[in-house]
């Protein structure tokens, strides 16, 4: 379970909520797994080059990257989209470059055991606005 922090990157958080409501993230595959560093998903083609249409404007977040931080994957400024990653450890070189979307609040041990090709389903938790 990861908690989206809309105050940190409000435009990105809004886009992610809309994609979740539309069902975009149903059965998404982790296409990139680097043990001890990061797992990445959000590409419906599962190869790392796809995503939702369009791109998101970059938002700076000074939040540090620690175990379980969820960040926006980028290929450069204003290139964010539906791909996101979760880090396994302290990664200070990502802070201020990749917007932070939230943190894993439950199941970090599961996150640490994810293998390439494992899938996830993102949905709104009960009690969240629909």
Annotate each PLM feature:
Residues 1-130:
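Cyclophilin-like peptidyl-prolyl cis-trans isomerases
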């Amino acid at each position: 379970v990861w908690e989206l922090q809309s105050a940190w990157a409000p435009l990105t958080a809004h886009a992610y909520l809309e994609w979740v409501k539309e069902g975009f993230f149903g059965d998404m595959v982790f296409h990139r797994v680097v043990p001890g560093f990061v797992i990445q998903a959000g590409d419906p083609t599962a190869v790392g080059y796809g995503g939702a249409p369009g791109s998101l404007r970059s938002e700076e977040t000074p939040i540090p990257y620690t175990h379980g931080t969820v960040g926006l994957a980028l290929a450069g400024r204003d290139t964010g989209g539906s791909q996101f990653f979760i880090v396994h450890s302290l990664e200070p070189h990502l802070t201020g470059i990749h917007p932070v979307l939230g943190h894993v609040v439950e199941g970090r041990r599961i996150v640490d055991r994810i293998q390439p090709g494992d899938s996830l389903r993102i949905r709104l938790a009960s009690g969240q606005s629909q």
